[in-house]
């Protein structure tokens, strides 16, 4: 017998093109404080709307939930600017591409945050359930002012951080980015050779397990 319209087994999308949370405990949920997004579970491609400030359906250990959106950056202050802040209900890892929150399906083709001041400000602020972030999560090579400000501030459970490939920096772009990440053992390499005012200010403050930070800039 031929079965028609059968649901395909396994993922039908590349979950690394989106912001994808991997649950490490049963009952994981995610909430973004501002901006509506779309989500799908286990890469099934069945995208559903998640309203601004709403909590996602729960998933269990080993499952994934992927997000995409065309999020609007609100305000222009370090306390309220950005697309919002995630609340993570249980322990998780995050992988994929943060640009999918700004550009949806086109995020994988975009490596510039030019003009996107405060874009990811406070995105994972005090997200103590966050454990690991994939290396390619922040692919932008051109940054904007305050774009990663406070991004992982207070993520005390964060063990591994994403690479930071940007070579074109702006003022305050990394300010407080990993402040208080007391479980972080290895800092991402900082490849930019030309800096901007306060670009690294307090970036790794109170990261008590770091032994060194490799930065490529030169002084004159």
Locate the predicted segments by residue:
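Negatively charged
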Residues: 2-220
């Amino acid at each position: 017998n031929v079965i028609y319209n059968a649901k395909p087994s396994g993922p039908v999308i590349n979950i690394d093109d989106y912001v994808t949370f991997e649950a490490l405990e049963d009952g994981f949920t995610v909430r973004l404080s501002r901006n509506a997004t779309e989500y799908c579970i286990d890469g099934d491609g069945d995208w559903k709307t998640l309203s601004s400030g709403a909590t996602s359906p729960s998933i269990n250990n080993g499952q994934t939930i992927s997000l995409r959106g065309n999020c609007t950056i609100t305000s222009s202050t370090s306390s309220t600017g950005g697309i919002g802040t995630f609340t993570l209900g249980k322990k998780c890892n995050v992988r994929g591409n943060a640009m999918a929150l700004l550009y949806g399906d086109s995020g994988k083709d975009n490596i510039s945050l030019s003009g996107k001041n405060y874009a990811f400000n406070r995105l994972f602020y005090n997200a103590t359930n966050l454990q690991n972030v994939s290396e390619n999560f922040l692919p932008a090579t051109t940054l904007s002012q305050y774009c990663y400000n406070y991004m992982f501030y207070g993520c005390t459970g964060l063990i591994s951080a994403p690479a930071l490939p940007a070579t074109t920096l702006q003022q305050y772009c990394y300010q407080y980015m990993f402040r208080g990440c007391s479980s972080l053992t290895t800092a991402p390499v900082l490849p930019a050779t030309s800096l901007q005012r306060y670009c690294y200010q307090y970036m790794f403050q109170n990261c008590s397990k770091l032994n060194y930070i490799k930065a490529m800039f030169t002084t004159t």
